[in-house]
UniProtKB/Swiss-Prot annotation:
Gene Ontology biological-process entries: lipoprotein localization to outer membrane; protein localization to outer membrane
Residues annotated as domain ABC transporter: 6-226
Binding site for ATP: G42, A43, S44, G45, S46, G47, K48, S49
Sequence similarity: Belongs to the ABC transporter superfamily. Lipoprotein translocase (TC 3.A.1.125) family.
Localization: Cell inner membrane
The keyword Transcription regulation is assigned to this record: no
Reported function: Part of the ABC transporter complex LolCDE involved in the translocation of mature outer membrane-directed lipoproteins, from the inner membrane to the periplasmic chaperone, LolA. Responsible for the formation of the LolA-lipoprotein complex in an ATP-dependent manner.
SUPFAM superfamilies found in the cross-reference section: P-loop containing nucleoside triphosphate hydrolases
Record-level Gene Ontology MF annotations: ATP binding; ATP hydrolysis activity; transmembrane transporter activity
Cysteines engaged in disulfide bonds, as pairs: none
Annotated protein name in UniProt: Lipoprotein-releasing system ATP-binding protein LolD
Length: 226
């Protein structure tokens, strides 16, 4: 039986706009198993990114519970929540958010450096992961010297360098051309299978979503089978 890495129940989020409460998520139930790959699709503005932020402990739900490796991140102090996030999760976004003044290997090593891993070890582990994503020849290059696909591969390396239990990816290929998007998506699936890391991807691309183990659609604030 697959263990559950990430779970939420009755998850809801309401935003205040002027004097009106606007519910974005109503009652979301989800369980992500070890090494499972899951795609969440839905219309623009349906709340996909909001859901990912709640699952990652980056935003606070209005109601409901989240459990990451059996721990409720919202019952922890801010420092404890950051530690849990940094050890258990990796994040990939549509825009790479790489630090322009640092090289590819330094960017990929950043989560380890934040965890106070010795710099030499952090860089060695980052170089190993960059090799796995086909960027051995780009270690010393800064983001401005890389193509869009290469920058996104560095972002993926940064997400997996800590060997997280789960990767949360928000439109990771949305800013790439079709061929590059295909390559990046295949890379994420390969790392998912080889490392046994769970993968939750928010995407508008139904073709890419179909290549995941499971697909769900966010409609009217709830998840449905796609």
């Amino acid at each position: 039986m697959n263990e559950t890495v990430l779970r939420c129940s009755g998850l809801g989020k309401t935003f205040r706009q002027g004097k009106v409460d606007v519910p974005v998520l109503r009652s979301v139930d989800l369980a992500v198993g070890t090494a499972e790959s899951l795609a969440i699709v839905g219309a623009s503005g349906s709340g996909k990114s909001t859901l990912l932020h709640l699952l990652g402990g980056l935003d606070t739900p209005t109601r409901g519970d989240v459990a990451l490796l059996g721990k409720n991140p919202f019952a922890l102090s801010e420092a404890e929540r950051c530690r849990l996030r940094n050890t258990a999760l990796g994040f990939v976004y549509q825009f790479h958010h790489l630090l322009p003044e640092f090289s590819a290997v330094e960017n990929a090593a950043m989560p380890l450096i934040i965890r106070r891993v010795a710099r030499a070890e952090a860089l060695a582990r980052a170089a190993e992961v960059l090799d796995a994503v086909g960027l051995t020849h780009r270690l010393a290059h800064r983001p401005g010297e890389l193509s869009g696909g290469e920058r996104q591969r560095v972002a993926i390396a940064r997400a997996v360098v800590t060997r997280p239990a789960c990767i949360l990816a928000d439109e990771p290929t949305g800013n790439l051309d079709h061929h590059t998007a295909d390559t990046v998506f295949d890379l994420m699936r390969e790392l998912n299978r080889k490392q046994g890391t769970s993968l939750v991807v928010v995407t508008h691309d139904v073709e890419l979503a179909a290549r995941m183990d499971r697909q769900l659609r966010l409609v009217d604030g709830t998840l449905q089978a796609a």
